């Protein structure tokens, strides 16, 4: 089988993205990784970290990099980069990394995209007049013409997808509708089957309220919205269980045999996942017409060029992308 080729965007240049990308040169991965970024920045960061990395220009027709080598698709930064110090002038550079990766997907050069962290605040500071930048997920969805995507984080033996993502807690209940639950669950079911190769994925669903509403005594979202949605989905042949109280759902005996958990909101599901797998977790965007994985952490500006950044999540993100490429065959 031909090795998959992934675009790895190096993210915010002042953060740890370049640092952790350099470690891919020493990770024995069953794929090719083309790091998208400024090769002069990568070289300078390698020197600052004392890492002996040979940078090679990425060539789709070549055989790939040897151990200690890193394939780089050079995209110049707008201005010089100082580790740990954000510069709005380089926000356009960060977005150009994503646009170049998307173009490579369209041209059949890349089999997927793996993203190092970017800094949403500095991008919004730089493009205040051109609209709010929500993040990687929304940007890739918009640019690829994808109407709906689903955020899923994965760690060892645990996958957690979200019905709602970055919403204030006061807005969550109103946002959870029967059509939304059904569409999110369908995307989750489809991608578990077709991108992870799971024939009949079992999905556990969390309730919204304490004790999953206690039969309507602690809220009506379960009886009025969540349960009817699950009944419709089961009639379609989707293997769902729940809704369960979130405080018992994540116990090992409950998770046994489950392929994913569907949580209603961000801080219901992700604290458990991050406690379970922080540093080895992966952010996966479901619903896109291509594979996209990412690290589960931010830019960590204070760690840039210090040698204290952990590349474990990035390496796991690449390994997960390989798993998905194989599962989609």
UniProtKB/Swiss-Prot annotation:
Keywords carried by this UniProt record? Cobalt, Cytoplasm, Magnesium, Metal-binding, NAD, NADP, Oxidoreductase, Pyridoxine biosynthesis, Zinc
Names of required cofactors: Zn(2+); Mg(2+); Co(2+)
Query: What does the record note about the cofactor?
Result: Binds 1 divalent metal cation per subunit. Can use ions such as Zn(2+), Mg(2+) or Co(2+).
Record-level GO cellular component terms? cytoplasm
Broad class of where this protein is predominantly found: cytoplasm
One function term, GO molecular function aspect: NAD binding
Catalysed conversion reaction? 4-(phosphooxy)-L-threonine + NAD(+) = 3-amino-2-oxopropyl phosphate + CO2 + NADH
GO terms, biological process: pyridoxal phosphate biosynthetic process; pyridoxine biosynthetic process
Binding-site list for substrate: 136-137, 274, 283, 292
Q: What is its EC number?
A: 1.1.1.262
Top enzyme class, one word, equals oxidoreductase
Function, please?
Answer: Catalyzes the NAD(P)-dependent oxidation of 4-(phosphooxy)-L-threonine (HTP) into 2-amino-3-oxo-4-(phosphooxy)butyric acid which spontaneously decarboxylates to form 3-amino-2-oxopropyl phosphate (AHAP).
Please verify whether the record's keywords include NAD.
yes
Please state where this protein is localized: Cytoplasm
Subunit record text: Homodimer.
Q: Where does a divalent metal cation bind?
A: 166, 211, 266
- Taxonomy, superkingdom: Bacteria
Q: What else is known?
A: The active site is located at the dimer interface.
NCBIfam families (UniProt xref) = pdxA
Pathway listed for it is: Cofactor biosynthesis; pyridoxine 5'-phosphate biosynthesis; pyridoxine 5'-phosphate from D-erythrose 4-phosphate: step 4/5
Q: Does the keyword NAD apply?
A: yes
Family the entry assigns: Belongs to the PdxA family.
This chain belongs to the protein called 4-hydroxythreonine-4-phosphate dehydrogenase
């Amino acid at each position: 089988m031909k090795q998959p080729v992934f675009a790895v965007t190096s993210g915010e240049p002042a953060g740890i993205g370049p640092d952790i990308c350099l470690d891919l040169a020493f990770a024995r991965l069953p794929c090719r990784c083309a790091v998208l970024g400024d090769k002069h920045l990568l070289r300078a960061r390698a020197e600052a970290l004392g890492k002996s990395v040979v940078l090679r220009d990425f060539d789709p027709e070549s055989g790939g990099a040897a151990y200690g080598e890193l394939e780089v698709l050079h995209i110049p930064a707008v201005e010089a980069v100082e580790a740990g110090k954000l510069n709005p002038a380089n926000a356009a550079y960060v977005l150009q990394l994503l646009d170049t990766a998307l173009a490579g997907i369209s041209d059949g050069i890349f089999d997927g995209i793996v993203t190092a962290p970017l800094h949403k605040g500095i991008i919004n500071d730089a493009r205040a007049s051109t609209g709010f930048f929500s993040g990687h997920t929304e940007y890739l969805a918009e640019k690829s013409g994808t109407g709906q995507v689903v955020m899923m984080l994965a760690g060892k033996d645990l996958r957690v997808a979200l019905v709602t993502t970055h919403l204030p807690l006061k807005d969550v209940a109103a946002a959870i509708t029967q059509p939304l639950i059904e569409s999110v669950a369908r995307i989750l079911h489809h991608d578990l089957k077709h991108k992870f190769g799971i024939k009949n994925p079992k999905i556990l669903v969390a309730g919204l309220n304490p004790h999953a509403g206690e039969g309507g005594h602690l809220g009506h979202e379960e009886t009025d919205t969540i349960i009817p949605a699950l009944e419709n989905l089961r009639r379609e042949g989707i293997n769902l269980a729940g809704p369960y109280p979130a405080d018992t759902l994540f116990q090992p005996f409950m998770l046994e045999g489950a392929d994913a958990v569907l949580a209603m909101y961000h801080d219901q599901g992700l604290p458990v996942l991050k406690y379970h797998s922080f540093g080895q977790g992966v952010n996966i965007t479901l619903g896109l017409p291509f594979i996209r994985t990412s690290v589960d952490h931010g830019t960590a500006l204070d760690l840039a060029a210090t040698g204290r950044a952990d590349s474990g999540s990035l390496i796991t993100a690449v390994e997960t992308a390989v798993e998905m490429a194989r599962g989609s065959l």
